[in-house]
Amino acid sequence: MAPRPAAAAVFVVGAVVALLLLPPPAAAAPVGVNWGTMMSHPIHPSAVVEMLRANGVDRVKLFDADPWTVAALAGSGVQAMLAAPNDQVASLARDPHRARDWVRHNVTANVNAGVDVRYVAVGNEPFLKSYNGSFINITFPALKNMQRALDEAGFGQRIKVVVPLNADIYSSPENKPVPSAGSFRKDINTLMVDIVNYLHANDAPFVVNIYPFLSLYHNPSFPLNFSFFDGATKPVYDQGMVYTNVFDANFDTLVWSLRKAGVPDMRIIVGEVGWPTDGDKNANIKYAQRFYNGFLRKMAKNIGTSLRPGRMEVYLFALIDENQKSVLPGRFERHWGLFTYDGKPKFSMDLSGNGKGNLAEVKGVQYLPSHWCVFNKDTKDKYKDLPASVNYACSNADCTPLGMSGLVLLEALQRSQQQMLHKEGACFQYMF
């Protein structure tokens, strides 16, 4: 489990807000959110829950079952998807007792405390090609052990086990890039058929993460406007269906894949969907706002897709920027949040999809006094070790927002000092 932040952390709220004192929640939004906590200065969970309620968000998807975070959901009316992270999948697959212990500590205890747990996720995107098959032989056994543990604890009918999967597990051939040609990846097709039939037999949904931004990021020739929902693109036609955006086309490719796997009516949840605001030429406020405005309008209308009309269950990715995430997938990884690291909305947005109102920010965030790093004019050869100084600073701070245009030493050191809580010496040898 992730350790709790130190008491000196910048964004710890001074007083925990009792849930009984929270204002009544706003009208429920048509979407949930992913709440990640990989940040150097986490906002107090109780303050985040208050913000969720103020914005009408009644569902969250977590990436673990951290007690400090989950406890804040007790009595809040916010439904939760808890998760056993990828580093726990092997032990869950190997030992059924581990699954029972996991359920006892993370499900039974939290449900008894008033947390509305709806799903338990086993791993996260375990079949990504970048994992080189590390989870192929252990995910299904872990899934079955977790399901048995929930059944034994009496939760099997109300809490469903799922495996959130990336959209790279299915595709259409290059010579026929339409949804009806879609199927599961050849290397995992048999496994996926087994998994989806097992999930379906237990009345559990298929959870898929769909990212139009990544279609654009990985393919420079991808038509930009096909990433959005305003119809400003050439449509794709497929067996009488018309697709004007990649989200719908991707979703229906999954529908076809499930049909071919023998579960045509399987329920689908979109576990992650969103647009980053920094770290790439196409990751910016303008495009993020365009994406969300179109997507939320679509969700509010409950129109679904060509093959699955009606209401969809979706979780936006993500709630708050996480400055401790790995940037191996890209510099944008730390900038998916609807809110900045200190809980402020990045842009005007209405989760109801009606185009009215703005996001409510996190209340009660406290800040340390402002300090600044400046050059010491008496330092000799102050430019000699400039690259080393930048590397030093960026080893402590998130420098990805400036990655597209080059990084200024003072800015890097300033970020480093903030992350190190203004410790003496954090400005390094070129500062005073």
Residues covered by each model-derived region:
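Terminal membrane/secretory targeting segments in land-plant proteins
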Residues: M1-G32, G357, V362-L368
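Active-site mouth loops of central-metabolism enzymes
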Residues: A28-I43, L92-R94, A181-R185, V374-Y383
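Hydrophobic faces of well-ordered beta-strands that scaffold small-molecule active sites
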Residues: V31-W35, D58-L62, V78-A84, R118-V122, ...
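Short, acidic/polar
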Residues: G36-L52, P96-N110, N189-V193, D385-S389
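Catalytic domains of carbohydrate-active enzymes, especially glycoside hydrolases
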Residues: S46-W68, Q79
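Substrate-binding and catalytic surfaces of secreted/luminal carbohydrate-active proteins
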Residues: V49, F140, K144-R148, F155-V163, ...
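Generic structural signal for hydrophobic
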Residues: M51-L52, A72-L73, N110, L199, ...
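Substrate-binding cleft of extracellular glycoside hydrolase catalytic domains
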Residues: A71-Y170, N175-R185, V270
